[in-house]
C-alpha cells in the first residue's frame, strides 16, 4: 500500500449506521485530514451472517455513492466469509463491489472459531488480490496481543505485501498502545507493520451501557512511524463518535488531541454529557463531588431526540436531581434546620434505587465492563484485569454524605 490509512472502520456489533450517517462521517473525516472509511458492520446480514447472498442493487448503489463521495477518502467494503468459503465464492460476492469502484477489500476473520485456518486465510487473500486486482485489509482470527501463534505463523508465511494485517493492540479494548507493543506485533507477523483496528470509542456488546465521549488518549505519537495506519471502531451513534474521532484526527496530524477534543465538545455542546458519562481516571471526569452549579448544568441539558444518546442524557439528569437534593439537605442541616423540616426536600433521594437500575451508566455508576481480553500463544482469548471494574457513583457519594450528616444531626439532638 502506497500510504498509511487513517480513519474509521464501522465494525461494531449492533444497529448499523444509515447511509446518511456514513456520508456525514466521510465528510467529517475528509475535513479533519483522515483518508479511510471501512464498511464492515457486524449486523449487516450480507456482510456476515448471510455472507454468501449477493449484495442487493440498493446496497451496491450505496457503496458506489460512498466510494465516489469524496476522493480524499478511500472506501473499503468488508466481508466476513464463512469457514467453508472458497476463493470463487468470495470473487462472485465481491466482484460487483469492485465494479462499483472499490479498490481495497476488507476480509474479516475475527471472532471465528478457526485458529487452524491461517494458511487458508492467506490463500483466500492472495486469490482476491490476484483475481480482482485489489489490495486486501485482513482482520486475522488472532487479532489481539503481542505473542505469536501457529495461526499467525501460517498466515504471515509468504503473505503478499498487498495484504495488510490488522491488530487491536495488546487486548481487544486497550487503554494504551505503545511503540514497543506495535514493534513486537510486527516482529511476530514477519516484520509486517500492523494496521491498528482501534476499538475506541466503540460501545457495543458488554460496553453497551456506556457512552465514550472522551478524547483520544493513550496512543504513543510515535506509533504513526511504525504502523500501516489506524482505524477507529466507532459507537452505534455516529454523532456521539465524532468528538473522539476529531481528537484522533488531530493526533494523526501531529497536533494536540486533547485541545482538539476540548474545542469540539465546547463548540458542539458535548462537554457536560461527556463529563457525566466519564469514569474516574479519565481526563474529562468531573470529580467525585462536583459543584452544585455543575449538577444544575446537567439537569438543564435539553431533551435529546437521538435515540442512541437520549437515554444517557435522561439518566444523567435523573442522577443530578438526586445530587441536588443531597446538596439541599446538607445545606439545610448546616443552616440549623430540623430533620422534620428536611423531609420534603429529601424525597428525591429515594429515587437512588431506580436510578442505579437504569441500564445507561452515568455519573460514574458501575460496574464498568469492557472486553479487556488478550490472545495467548495459541490464539485463544485470555482474560486480563480491567474486564469488570466496580465503581461507586457520584450519586452514591452524595447519598453517603447525606447519611453521615443526618447521623451527626441525630447525635446532637
Task: Go through each PLM region and give its residues.
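Feature activates predominantly on carbohydrate-active enzymes
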Residues: 1-85, 99-103
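Catalytic-core regions of glycoside hydrolase
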Residues: 9-11, 93, 99, 103, ...
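Conserved beta-strand positions in the central sheet of alpha/beta enzyme cores
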Residues: 38, 106-108, 231
Amino acid at each position: 500500500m502506497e500510504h498509511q490509512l487513517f480513519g474509521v472502520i464501522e465494525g461494531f456489533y449492533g444497529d448499523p449506521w444509515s447511509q446518511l450517517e456514513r456520508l456525514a462521517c466521510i465528510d467529517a473525516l475528509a475535513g479533519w485530514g483522515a483518508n479511510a472509511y471501512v464498511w464492515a458492520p457486524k449486523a449487516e446480514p450480507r456482510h456476515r451472517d448471510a455472507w454468501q447472498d449477493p449484495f442487493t442493487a440498493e446496497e451496491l448503489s450505496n457503496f458506489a455513492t460512498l466510494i465516489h463521495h469524496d476522493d480524499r477518502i478511500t472506501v473499503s467494503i468488508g466481508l466476513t466469509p464463512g469457514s467453508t468459503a472458497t476463493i470463487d465464492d468470495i470473487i462472485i460476492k465481491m466482484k460487483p463491489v469492485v465494479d462499483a469502484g472499490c479498490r481495497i477489500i476488507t476480509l474479516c476473520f475475527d471472532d471465528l472459531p478457526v485458529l487452524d485456518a491461517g494458511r487458508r486465510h492467506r490463500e483466500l487473500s492472495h486469490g482476491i488480490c490476484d483475481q480482482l486486482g485489489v489490495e486486501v485489509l485482513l482482520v486475522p482470527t488472532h487479532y489481539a496481543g503481542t505473542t505469536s501463534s501457529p495461526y499467525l505463523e501460517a498466515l504471515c508465511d509468504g503473505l503478499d505485501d498487498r495484504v495488510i494485517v490488522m491488530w487491536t493492540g495488546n487486548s481487544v479494548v486497550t487503554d494504551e498502545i505503545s511503540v514497543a507493543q506495535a514493534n513486537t506485533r510486527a516482529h511476530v507477523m514477519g516484520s509486517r507493520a500492523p494496521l491498528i483496528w482501534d476499538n475506541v470509542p466503540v460501545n457495543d456488546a458488554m460496553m453497551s451501557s456506556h457512552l465514550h465521549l472522551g478524547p483520544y488518549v493513550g496512543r504513543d505519537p510515535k506509533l504513526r512511524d511504525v504502523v500501516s495506519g489506524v482505524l477507529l471502531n466507532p459507537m452505534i451513534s455516529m454523532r456521539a463518535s465524532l468528538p473522539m474521532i476529531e481528537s484522533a484526527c488531530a493526533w494523526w496530524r501531529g497536533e494536540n488531541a486533547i485541545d482538539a477534543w476540548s474545542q469540539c465538545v465546547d463548540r458542539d455542546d458535548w462537554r457536560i454529557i461527556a463529563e457525566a458519562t466519564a469514569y474516574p481516571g479519565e481526563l474529562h471526569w468531573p470529580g467525585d463531588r462536583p459543584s452544585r452549579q455543575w449538577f444544575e448544568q446537567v439537569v438543564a441539558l435539553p431533551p435529546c431526540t437521538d435515540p442512541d444518546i437520549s437515554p444517557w442524557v435522561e439518566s444523567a439528569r435523573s442522577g443530578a436531581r438526586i445530587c441536588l437534593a443531597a446538596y439541599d439537605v446538607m445545606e439545610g442541616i448546616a443552616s440549623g434546620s430540623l430533620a422534620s423540616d428536611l423531609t420534603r426536600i429529601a424525597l428525591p433521594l429515594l429515587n437512588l434505587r431506580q436510578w442505579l437500575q437504569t441500564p445507561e451508566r452515568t455519573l460514574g455508576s458501575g460496574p464498568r465492563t469492557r472486553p479487556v481480553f488478550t490472545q495467548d500463544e495459541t490464539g485463544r482469548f485470555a482474560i486480563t484485569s480491567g474486564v469488570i471494574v466496580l465503581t461507586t457513583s457520584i450519586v452514591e457519594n452524595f447519598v453517603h454524605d447525606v447519611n453521615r450528616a443526618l447521623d451527626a444531626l441525630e447525635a446532637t439532638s
